[in-house]
Design a protein with these regions (language model features):
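Glycine- and acidic
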Residues: 5-6, 46, 121, 137, ...
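Membrane-interface helix-loop-helix modules in multi-pass membrane proteins
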Residues: 16, 62-142
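Generic structural hydrophobic/aromatic packing signal, biased to beta-strands
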Residues: 13, 80, 119-125, 139-140, ...
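Hydrophobic alpha-helical transmembrane segments of multi-pass membrane proteins
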Residues: 7-11, 67-68, 123-130, 159, ...
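Juxtamembrane interface at the ends
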Residues: 26-33, 135-141, 218-225
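Conserved small/polar residues in nucleotide/adenosyl-binding loops
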Residues: 244-251
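P-loop potassium selectivity filter motif centered on the GYG triad
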Residues: 85-121, 184-241
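N-terminal alpha-helical transmembrane segments of multi-pass membrane transport
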Residues: 1-93, 144-145, 149, 153, ...
Length: 251
């Protein structure tokens, strides 16, 4: 890496961290953010079924809500992984590691059975990061001596107002760079030697975007970001490092 390339990485990071940090601060303090009307319209049907009034919670209720939500998501994800042909031990390890945001990659990405399994893990990459952010928000408010807030409100807004918009921008950029974005798990191609080869595919752009934003370690492919479908060019590396992997985790 040349000094100029390193400068570009740091420049993009420095330009992004201040506005993103201010946006996150508004979410923490329950202030109106950019696109407030749009986000509120998106969040309303999410809160309504669970009858969430976004009332302030006690420390006990906040922690219980955190545990219940994550337990429910673990059970759902473990069930999906198991029903799609993954071994019980692999389903347990993968679900636990993704929901705790540690993302041990004991699975072989190319042979991760089923599109539903991949979508379930993408969901956990959003919710595990959002759960951690919600707990951090509560700690910050507690240190400031103000009310802790509502866990359901914090986790939803972490996704709708930060993780999801940032992931969409990153995913579009990665698709432009050449990363595959498809629900097909594989394709068969004819090689120059006349034989046939099975090439694994998947929603790589979506996966990579939230993988880096949420500091998740599990890759869509076995070799993770060294695989050409996860990091196809210098520009995709800029997006992965400067925009997603440095900005939000640093804040």
């Amino acid at each position: 890496m040349t000094l100029f390339s390193l400068f570009l990485y740091l420049l993009a990071f420095i330009l992004l961290i201040i506005p993103v940090g201010k946006h996150l601060a508004k979410i923490i303090m329950h202030e109106k953010t950019v696109g407030e009307k749009i986000f509120s319209a998106i969040e309303a049907p999410i809160f309504k079924p669970v009858k969430c009034k976004c009332e302030n919670m006690s420390l006990k209720n906040y922690l219980v809500s955190f545990l219940v939500v994550n337990l429910a998501m673990y059970i759902l994800t473990h069930g999906i992984l198991a029903m799609q042909g993954n071994s019980p031990s692999l389903a347990f390890n993968t679900a636990i590691s993704f929901i705790t945001n540690t993302n041990l990659q004991h699975y072989s990405g190319e042979w991760l059975n089923g599109t539903a399994s991949r979508l379930a893990l993408i969901n956990l990459m959003f919710t595990s990061a959002a759960s951690g952010m919600a707990i951090c928000m509560a700690i910050i408010r507690g240190v400031m001596g103000i009310r802790l807030g509502n866990f359901y409100e914090d986790i939803v807004k972490s996704v709708t107002r930060l993780l999801l918009p940032a992931s969409i921008i990153a995913a579009v950029g990665l698709v432009i760079c050449g990363l595959p974005q498809t629900f097909d798990t594989q394709t068969v191609v004819k090689t120059v030697e006349g034989g046939y080869q099975v090439i694994a595919l998947g929603p790589a752009a979506t996966w990579e975007a939230i993988k880096h934003l949420g500091t998740n370690g599990g890759g869509l492919f076995s070799s993770n970001s060294t695989h050409p479908f996860e990091n196809v060019s210098l520009w995709s590396n800029y997006i992965a490092v400067s925009y997603t992997h440095l900005t939000l985790p640093t804040i």
